[in-house]
């Protein structure tokens, strides 16, 4: 969802009551209008997904996983994950645990890679050209974060505790659990990297479905 219109106080306040009180409070807690808009946009996307699944958004309750990932109570086959960056909020929904991440691509120093990644991932980054480094870095970063979110552990899981295997087919080498994970990337949004990770196996190509607030 492109959330720029939600930065308007009038639009923001007009849509705010459409989401649960907990999301209203979270959205209003941000200092900057862009962050408030992103948070509200994420809540509106979740509302829409719940309605499409035949679930009344007004009657849902959430609980937190061990890694503080929100999980929907009473609906074991409805798994979701939210992410936002720049002016976009995204939502992924699946029938098994899912993690999604979107990042707006900006300049970042190569030296940063040495501090956060597994040695195999560092080798991948070091092999990138100057032109390819920024998109390659954000591909890797979003793939890693999508996996961390799919496990439910989030950033309680160290970035160097597992290795994303970058190749013709994306994979992960990990000892976090004994589950299998599938990955895919969405490259339909220029200037952004988007990755999806789902527990249970391979994922096909996922098209980006844009929702714009007018």
Indicate residue ranges for each PLM-predicted region.
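Core catalytic alpha/beta fold that binds nucleotide/phospho-ligands
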Residues: 1-214
């Amino acid at each position: 969802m492109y959330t720029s219109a939600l930065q308007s106080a009038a639009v923001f306040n007009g849509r705010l009551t459409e989401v649960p009180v907990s999301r209203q409070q979270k959205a209003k807690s941000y200092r900057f209008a862009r962050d408030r808009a992103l948070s509200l946009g994420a809540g509106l996307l979740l509302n829409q997904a719940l309605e499409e699944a035949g679930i009344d958004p007004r009657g849902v309750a959430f609980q937190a996983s061990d890694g503080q990932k929100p999980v929907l109570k009473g609906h074991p086959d409805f798994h979701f994950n939210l992410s936002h960056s720049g002016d976009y909020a995204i939502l992924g929904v699946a029938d098994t645990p899912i993690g999604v991440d979107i990042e707006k691509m900006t300049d970042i120093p190569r030296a940063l890679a040495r501090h956060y990644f597994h040695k195999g991932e560092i080798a991948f980054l070091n092999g990138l050209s100057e032109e390819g480094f920024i998109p390659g870095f954000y591909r890797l970063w979003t793939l890693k974060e999508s996996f961390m979110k799919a496990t439910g552990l989030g950033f309680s899981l160290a970035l160097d505790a597992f290795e994303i295997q970058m190749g013709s087919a994306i994979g992960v080498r990990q000892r976090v659990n004994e589950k299998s994970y599938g990955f895919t990337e969405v490259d339909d949004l220029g200037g952004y990297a988007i990755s999806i990770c789902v527990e249970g196996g391979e994922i096909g190509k996922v098209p980006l479905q844009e929702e714009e607030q007018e």
